[in-house]
Structure formats: structure tokens, C-alpha cells
Amino acid sequence: MLGAALRRCAVAAATRAGPRGLLHSTRTPGPAAAIQSVRCYSHGSQETDEEFDARWVTYFNKPDIDAWELRKGINTLVTYDMVPEPKIIDAALRACRRLNDFASTVRILEAVKDKAGPHKEIYPYVIQELRPTLNELGISTPEELGLDKL
């Protein structure tokens, strides 16, 4: 999104420039130029952790979620620079179960392990928190399936 905002600013600046380019502009920037630069960098208020978690839990708890939306949500969630909270993963696993998509459950758990990176205590904590859900839904972890040895 930042790249698009910067491109919009560059295009706006180029359209305001004179015939000889930006350095030799015939017009002096007025108050609108200051407003334009502020708009290019404002993205609204920051989302709190609780709002972020609630947004994703709500997304995965949609009763009419389909397989494409599930995969899109998982892919988007994996791109963030963080390990999702267990309650988000719980909602995603339940959505997988509603859709009978076992492959996605394994993929989610593998992604969580990968996102934990060198912090070896995170993945066991997440599995510990998810153990009741995993047992309830009949989901095996990648380690239980022997996928960690491949």
C-alpha cells in the first residue's frame, strides 16, 4: 500500500510540475501541496492487537466461508510478520473442519511452526493451547503424522 501511495504522490507532483520538470517548476506550491503530502502518508488509525485478533476470528467464523476464502485468509495471515494467536488458529482450524479440508489444517500448523522460526518455545505453546480443539476435531499435528521427519 505504501508503494501505491508513493506512486500517487509522484504522479501528483509530476502533474504539478512545469514544462521543464520538477526542479524548474513555474508555480510555487500552495497550501494544497502540503495537504497532498499529508494525505500520501496517512493510513488512518492503528489497529490494536485485540481488534486484529477479533477481525480474524470473525473472518474464519463466517458460517458461509468457502474453500477459496479460507485459503485466502490463511495466505494473508501467513504474510504478516508474527505468529497468530491460538484463538485465530482455533477459528481457522474449525473453518477447515467445516469444509472438510484436512490438508489446510496441516498447512496451518506447519505455517505456525515456520513462523515461530528460531523461537522453539512458541510452537509447543500454541499446540498446547490448541490441544483440546485438535482432539475435538480429530486433527493430527504434522509431528504426529511424521511429516517433521521428511
Swiss-Prot record:
GO terms for biological process: mitochondrial electron transport, cytochrome c to oxygen. It is found in: Mitochondrion inner membrane. In response to mitochondrial stress, the precursor protein is ubiquitinated by the SIFI complex in the cytoplasm before mitochondrial import, leading to its degradation. Within the SIFI complex, UBR4 initiates ubiquitin chain that are further elongated or branched by KCMF1. It is a peripheral membrane protein. GO terms for molecular function: metal ion binding. Pathway: Energy metabolism; oxidative phosphorylation. CDD domains: Cyt_c_Oxidase_Va. Keywords: Acetylation, Heme, Iron, Membrane, Metal-binding, Mitochondrion, Mitochondrion inner membrane, Phosphoprotein, Transit peptide, Ubl conjugation. Residues 1-41 form a transit peptide. A motif (SIFI-degron) lies at residues 2-17. SUPFAM superfamilies: Cytochrome c oxidase subunit E. The modification N6-acetyllysine is found at residues 87, 113. The modification Phosphothreonine is found at residue 141. One of its GO terms (cellular component) is mitochondrial inner membrane. InterPro entries: Cyt_c_oxidase_su5A/6, Cyt_c_oxidase_su5A/6_sf. Belongs to the cytochrome c oxidase subunit 5A family. Component of the cytochrome c oxidase (complex IV, CIV), a multisubunit enzyme composed of 14 subunits. The complex is composed of a catalytic core of 3 subunits MT-CO1, MT-CO2 and MT-CO3, encoded in the mitochondrial DNA, and 11 supernumerary subunits COX4I, COX5A, COX5B, COX6A, COX6B, COX6C, COX7A, COX7B, COX7C, COX8 and NDUFA4, which are encoded in the nuclear genome. Component of the cytochrome c oxidase, the last enzyme in the mitochondrial electron transport chain which drives oxidative phosphorylation. The respiratory chain contains 3 multisubunit complexes succinate dehydrogenase (complex II, CII), ubiquinol-cytochrome c oxidoreductase (cytochrome b-c1 complex, complex III, CIII) and cytochrome c oxidase (complex IV, CIV), that cooperate to transfer electrons derived from NADH and succinate to molecular oxygen, creating an electrochemical gradient over the inner membrane that drives transmembrane transport and the ATP synthase. This is Cytochrome c oxidase subunit 5A, mitochondrial. It comes from Pongo pygmaeus.
